[in-house]
């Protein structure tokens, strides 16, 4: 059991049976008031950011998540099948854990998966992936005012790309911001 004074980025907490990852924390001192710790936390069940205040030296339950590297194989019904790259176990990941990241999954993509015991709580894609452009819209009605156009990637993701990108090009994409980085 740790205390609120020991909060550091990357630490995982259990609060009301929910897991949170500490993104940042700062000690706040107010005139004629009691100082406290203000933390930005990421809810691992839905990836939403929340702010929480803790009293100084307040006991907190820190937990250890196990990080495993998984390679995407294929979707299977409402779940996604991955292969643990270390022990070669197959792991079924529920759709709600993968939601929001599905459009970047293709066979062979390696992700980080975070487990608490045997339960998977979160997955994290690599920040950058190289994907093939399956289709681009080049007609004037689909062009955006900023000169970009919409491209549909091999995984089904839709992103804005510069006008010179064509079907069949391989591009580097930022999976966190859904942005085009460069042609490969």
From Swiss-Prot:
Annotated metabolic or biological route of this protein: Protein biosynthesis; polypeptide chain elongation
Chief location bin: cytoplasm
InterPro entries according to UniProt: Elong-fact-P_C, NA-bd_OB-fold, Rib_uL2_dom2, Transl_elong_fac_P/YeiP, Transl_elong_KOW-like, Transl_elong_P/YeiP_cen, Transl_elong_P/YeiP_CS, Transl_elongation_fac_P
GO terms of molecular function: translation elongation factor activity
Swiss-Prot/TrEMBL keywords: Cytoplasm, Elongation factor, Protein biosynthesis
Protein family according to the UniProt entry: Belongs to the elongation factor P family.
One GO-annotated biological process of the protein: peptide biosynthetic process
Intracellular or extracellular location(s): Cytoplasm
Keyword field contains RNA-binding: no
HAMAP family with a match to the protein in the record: EF_P (MF_00141)
First and last residue of the signal peptide: none
Originating gene: efp1
Organism per entry: Protochlamydia amoebophila (strain UWE25)
GO CC annotations on file: cytoplasm
Pfam family, one: EFP_N
Record flagged with keyword Cytoplasm: yes
Its biological purpose: Involved in peptide bond synthesis. Stimulates efficient translation and peptide-bond synthesis on native or reconstituted 70S ribosomes in vitro. Probably functions indirectly by altering the affinity of the ribosome for aminoacyl-tRNA, thus increasing their reactivity as acceptors for peptidyl transferase.
Protein name as catalogued: Elongation factor P 1
Native organism taxonomy: Bacteria, Pseudomonadati, Chlamydiota, Chlamydiia, Parachlamydiales
């Amino acid at each position: 059991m740790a205390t609120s004074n020991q909060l550091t980025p990357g630490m995982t907490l259990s609060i009301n049976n929910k897991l949170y990852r500490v993104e940042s924390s700062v000690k706040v001192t107010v005139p004629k008031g009691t100082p406290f710790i203000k933390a930005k936390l990421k809810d691992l069940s839905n990836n939403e950011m929340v702010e929480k205040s803790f009293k100084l030296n307040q006991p907190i339950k820190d937990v250890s998540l196990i990080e495993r590297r998984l390679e995407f194989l294929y979707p299977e019904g409402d779940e996604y099948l991955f292969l643990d790259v270390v022990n070669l176990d197959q792991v079924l990941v529920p759709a709600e854990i993968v939601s929001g990241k599905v459009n970047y999954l293709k066979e062979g993509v390696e992700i980080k998966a975070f487990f608490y015991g045997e339960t998977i709580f979160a997955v994290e894609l690599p920040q950058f992936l190289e994907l093939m452009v399956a289709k681009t819209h080049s007609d004037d009605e689909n062009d955006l005012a900023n000169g970009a156009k919409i491209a549909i990637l091999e995984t089904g993701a839709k992103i804005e790309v510069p006008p010179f990108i064509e079907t069949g090009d391989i591009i580097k994409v930022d999976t966190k911001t859904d942005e085009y980085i460069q042609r490969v």
